[in-house]
Amino acid sequence: MLTENEWNTINNMLLELYTIDELDVFTSKIMKMIRMLIPYTKGWFIILDDDRKIRKEQSYFIGFDNDVKDRYTDVFYSEDYIQYLYDFISETSVYRDTSILESDVREKTDFYIKFLKPEDIIFGCGIILIKNSRIIGMFNLFRNEKSGDFNEKELYVLNLLKNHIANMLHNVMRLDRASITVNKSLNNFAKTYGLTSRESEILSLINKGLSNQEISDKVVISVSTVKKHIYNI
């Protein structure tokens, strides 16, 4: 079903994605890379909390302005018929919007009439990402009426990628939570001991495992100055 070039694209994409350990980089990168395999006009990568609410600051949207992002996250997410699937699936699953509801039913929903149709994104597909029996995210691609619906080959590609994406997202989210905890500890340490902004910056880089030379290159100061800051810390 796939050409050799398409298989190579998938392999190279996964190899690159597995090296990413920052959540915002991961979500933006995958949304951009997937276009090489599945053309789309707009899309989003939604991150969900334990209550299936959108973690707005950590979610990534492409092709939408801020007003539309806010309308979806604040109003239309609760009306999105994708939630019909939430209670019926137990593992990471690929879906196509036109397969969730019959067209005559779908086109009468508020979500279709007030959001999808005005934004000209009437065709959609994606992945509901589940790890340890919990929905952790939702990956959605959209097309306008002119571009047409997503086909079986494109859904096949998503099925090939789905478990990789779920595993990568789970790992990156775990690292993100750990990073937030560490940053809070570093900030508290800096406040307690009255570190300067430069000393705080160097402390953060040390925590990331950078050598004195790497810190010197990054903040554009000499290695000897780096050592002086470390001594003060």
Where in the sequence are the language-model features?
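Pre-recognition alpha-helix immediately N-terminal to the DNA-recognition helix
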Residues: 12, 200-205
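Glycine-rich acetyl-CoA-binding "A-motif" of GNAT/NAT acetyltransferases
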Residues: 135
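Recognition helix of helix-turn-helix DNA-binding domains
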Residues: 210-233
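Regulatory hinge/linker segments at domain boundaries
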Residues: 176-201
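Regulatory input/activation interfaces that engage signals or partners
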Residues: 13-21, 29-132, 141-144
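Signal-transmission linkers at sensory-effector interfaces
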Residues: 1-19
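Regulatory loop-to-helix N-cap segments in sensory/regulatory domains
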Residues: 2, 143-158
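Signal-transmission/dimerization alpha-helices at domain junctions
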Residues: 157-176
